[in-house]
Amino acid sequence: AHEGYQIYNGYMGSTSDQSIGKLKELGVNSLTIIPYSGFRSMNKPFPISYTTGAGGENDASILHAAYTAHQNGMSVMLKPQLWSWLGWTGDITMTNQKDWDLFFEYYEQWIMHYALMAEMYRFEMFCIGVEFQNASLSEHNKWDELFDKVRKIYTGKITYAANWGKEFETVSFWDKLDFIAVNCYYPLSTKMNPTDEELLTAFEKNLDVIEA
């Protein structure tokens, strides 16, 4: 389940459709669909599998959720994402260039599957990566190449979801994308009970960083 989007048993479950209906009532006009896959090593390249289980984000469930969103007047962004108990994707670091090359080869095979899906079923937006901080800062040329390859098969808007802070503020490839995306977890306060004014002031400071 996701915050604000209360589902179980995947996007094919009845509660998924109900949740999309509730979002429409709230005035939501865009839905992000996230197919997850796991990674098996923090420092070795690995083939990436696709979710196939009935309760996961398999292709059929993705298309069902996208169809339901479109029927409710929403645009759709497909945002494939890697996740693991091993650690954060931003800490994935290969030890040599050969391994980085193979890592991106595996990642390209995986992400292109979803790029083709997004094109075939007319998803309005496609997110090509999520919080690969070490990989995005050290291998920006690989990302540039991947963005170009995705554009050859996908004609919608593309982006990359950077982590707040160092990655978002220093990554070099924003000019290759249609819009900037940041997972905006900038802290607002260390207090247990901050005032509204304190939170607003902290938010505005973070907003200055984002807008810069």
Report residues per predicted region:
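Boundary/entry segment of secreted carbohydrate-active catalytic domains
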Residues: 1-23
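Alpha-helical scaffolding within the catalytic cores
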Residues: 15-19, 109-114, 162-172, 207-210
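Aromatic/hydrophobic pocket-lining residues that form the small-molecule binding cavity
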Residues: 16, 58-62, 107, 111, ...
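Substrate-binding cleft and catalytic face of glycoside hydrolase catalytic domains
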Residues: 26-46, 59-136
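Surface-exposed cleft-lining segments at the edges of enzyme active sites
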Residues: 48-52, 100-101, 130-137, 187-205
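Short, hinge-like loop/turn segments at secondary-structure boundaries
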Residues: 49-51, 94-97, 176-178
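Glycoside hydrolase catalytic-domain groove-lining segments
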Residues: 57-60, 64-75, 79, 152, ...
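Aromatic-lined carbohydrate-recognition surfaces of secreted/lumenal glycan-active proteins
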Residues: 75-88, 125-137, 144-169, 212
